[in-house]
Regions:
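Conserved hydrophobic residue
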Residues: 49-50, 74, 263-264, 379, ...
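Charged, flexible cofactor/metal-binding loops and thiol motifs
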Residues: 117-124, 128, 143, 151, ...
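A helix-coil-helix interface module used to build multimeric assemblies
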Residues: 1-201, 206-213, 274-275, 286, ...
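Short runs of predominantly hydrophobic/aromatic residues within well-ordered alpha helices
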Residues: 37, 84, 88, 234-237, ...
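Glycine-rich cofactor/substrate-binding loops
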Residues: 1-36, 97-98, 279-459
Length: 459
C-alpha cells in the first residue's frame, strides 16, 4: 500500500504508477532530501514534538541512508513514487516505528520545495565557480594580446581596428554579468520553505528559523501558499543559464567564423575538433558548433517551465513535478558547455599576423581620417562626406587610404598634412582611443587589472 493509501479502496493502475513516478529523475535530490529530513527531525526532537529518542533514531538512520546513497548502495523503488517516499519507506524499514514520525509537521509540497532550493543553491555556486575559471582564462588571453591588432566588426563587415585583448574583454564583461545573475539566482533560492505544510502551515510549534540555521538558509518563507508554489527561483536559474548559454553561443559563432579559411584568425586544437567520414581534409569545429546548438535546448527548458507555471492556481499542483526535468537538463547542459568551452579556449591558437593584416583592409581607418579633419577645424559632417568620397576614390583605384599621396589627399581637402600618414596607421588608430572602455592598450590594461581585482575580492 502507498504511504498515502488509507483513503483508497484499490491500488493505482500500473499505467498510473509509471506515469506518476518521478524517482527516475528526482533521485538526484537524494542528498538534499535526506539532509533536509535530518534537520527537520533534529528540530522535531528539540521542540518536543516527537520523543527525543525517536528523533535520534531517525537522524542516525538517515545518516546511514545518506552514506549508502553516496556509496551507490541504494536502489530506488518506482512504486514508491518519488525520492521523498523512497527515503521515508527505507528509513522505516531500517529503524521501525520511529521512522513513521519523520513526516510530522511536513508535507511533500514544502519538502520538495526545500529540496529544489537546496539543489538550486548548489547549482548556482557550482556555475559561479566555472564562470570564474572562464573569466580568468579570458583575462590571461587579454593580457597576452594587449598589442595584437585586429579588425573590429559591425554588420560582420570590417569597421575599425581594435585589439584582441579588447575583444576578449568584451566577453569578460558578458560572463561577469552572468556571474552576477547567478548570485541573484542564489539569493532567490536562499529561502527556507519548510513549515509551509501542504499550503496552510501546521499546528505544530515548529522552529522554522532553527531548520533554516541547520541547513544554511539566510531566511524563511513568509507565506505558506507562496512557500509551496513558488518556482521563481528555478526560473531565475534557467533565465541566467539561458543568457549565459547565449553568450557562449555568440563566442562559439565567432570562433567558428575565425576558424574558416576565409578568416584564418584562429586554429582550433586537434583535441577540440573532429574530422569528416568522407572528406579527409576536414577539421571541423564541432565542439563550438555543438555548444551553439545546445543553447536552444536551454531556451526550451526556460520556456517549458514558464509555460508550465503560467496557468497554475495557488497552491501546489502536480504540474510542478515537471520543473525538475527542465532545471536538471539546463544545469547539465550549461555545466558541460562551460567546462568544454573553457578547456577549448585555453588551447586556441590566435594567428596574430593574420589578424593584424586583416585590420589594414576594409578602410578600418576611415573614421580616424574623418577625426583627423575634425581636429583641424572641419565640421564632422563635412569631414564624413570628404572621407566618404576618398573611400569611393580608393575603391575605383584599388588603393587603401595610406596608399594615397599627400597631393592626392589635398585634392579632397586642404587640411590634410604630412602627419596624416602616421595618424592613420593601425597602431595609432588603436592607441589614440584612450578613454575608459576603449581599446588603447593602457585602457585595456586598466580593465584587466580591475577585472582581476574583482575576481579576487569576490572569490
Amino acid at each position: 500500500m502507498k504511504l498515502w493509501g488509507g483513503r483508497f479502496s484499490k491500488a493505482t493502475d500500473g499505467l498510473v504508477d509509471d506515469f506518476h513516478s518521478s524517482i527516475s529523475f528526482d533521485q538526484r535530490l537524494a542528498e538534499q532530501d535526506i539532509t533536509g529530513s535530518i534537520a527537520h527531525a533534529t528540530m522535531l526532537g528539540e521542540q518536543g514534538i516527537i520523543p527525543q529518542e525517536d528523533a535520534d533514531k531517525i537522524v542516525e538512520g538517515l545518516r546511514g541512508i545518506l552514506a549508502d546513497v553516496k556509496a551507490g548502495k541504494v536502489h530506488w523503488m518506482v512504486d514508491a513514487e518519488d525520492i521523498h517516499m523512497n527515503v521515508e519507506a527505507l528509513l522505516t524499514e531500517r529503524i521501525g516505528e520511529a521512522g513513521k514520525r519523520l513526516h510530522t509537521g511536513r508535507s511533500r509540497n514544502d519538502q520538495v520545495a526545500l529540496d529544489c532550493r537546496m539543489y538550486a543553491k548548489l547549482a548556482c555556486k557550482e556555475t559561479q565557480e566555472m564562470l570564474r575559471e572562464l573569466l580568468s582564462v579570458l583575462l590571461d588571453i587579454a593580457q597576452d594580446n594587449l598589442h595584437t591588432i585586429m579588425p573590429g566588426y559591425t554588420h560582420l563587415q570590417k569597421a575599425q581596428p581594435i585589439t584582441l585583448a579588447h575583444h576578449m574583454m568584451a566577453y569578460f564583461q558578458m560572463f561577469r554579468r552572468d556571474l552576477d545573475r547567478f548570485a541573484h539566482a542564489y539569493d532567490a533560492a536562499d529561502v527556507m520553505p519548510l513549515g509551509s505544510g501542504a499550503l496552510a502551515g501546521t499546528t505544530y510549534p515548529l522552529n522554522r528559523e532553527r531548520v533554516a540555521e541547520l541547513l544554511g538558509f539566510s531566511r524563511i518563507s513568509m507565506n505558506s501558499l507562496d512557500g509551496v508554489s513558488d518556482r521563481d527561483f528555478l526560473l531565475e536559474y534557467l533565465s541566467a543559464a539561458s543568457i549565459c548559454m547565449m553568450h557562449l553561443s555568440r563566442f562559439c559563432e565567432e570562433l567558428i567564423l575565425w576558424n574558416t579559411n576565409e578568416f584564418r584568425f584562429v586554429e582550433m586544437d586537434d583535441a577540440f575538433a573532429t574530422g569528416s567520414s568522407i572528406m579527409p581534409q576536414k577539421k571541423n569545429p564541432d565542439v563550438a558548433e555543438l555548444i551553439r546548438g545546445k543553447t536552444g535546448r536551454v531556451y526550451g527548458d526556460l520556456m517549458g517551465l514558464l509555460t508550465t507555471m503560467k496557468g497554475l492556481p495557488l497552491a501546489y499542483n502536480k504540474d510542478m513535478q515537471a520543473d525538475k526535468e527542465a532545471f536538471f537538463d539546463a544545469r547539465d547542459t550549461l555545466v558541460k558547455g562551460l567546462t568544454v568551452f573553457t578547456a577549448m579556449l585555453r588551447t586556441v591558437t590566435f594567428r596574430k599576423d593574420v589578424m593584424e593584416k586583416g585590420a589594414s583592409g576594409g578602410f578600418t581607418n576611415a573614421t580616424d581620417c574623418a577625426d583627423y579633419l575634425v581636429k583641424r577645424g572641419v565640421p564632422f559632417r563635412d569631414a564624413h562626406a570628404v572621407v566618404g568620397r576618398l573611400v569611393a576614390h580608393c575603391l575605383n583605384e584599388n588603393k587603401a587610404l595610406l596608399d594615397l599621396s599627400l597631393d592626392e589627399l589635398k585634392q579632397f581637402h586642404p587640411a590634410f598634412e604630412a602627419d596624416v600618414f602616421d595618424d592613420l596607421s593601425m597602431l595609432s588608430c588603436v592607441e589614440k582611443r584612450r578613454i575608459p572602455g576603449a581599446p588603447a592598450p593602457d585602457m585595456v590594461q586598466a580593465a584587466i587589472d580591475e577585472g582581476r581585482k574583482s575576481l579576487e575580492e569576490n572569490a
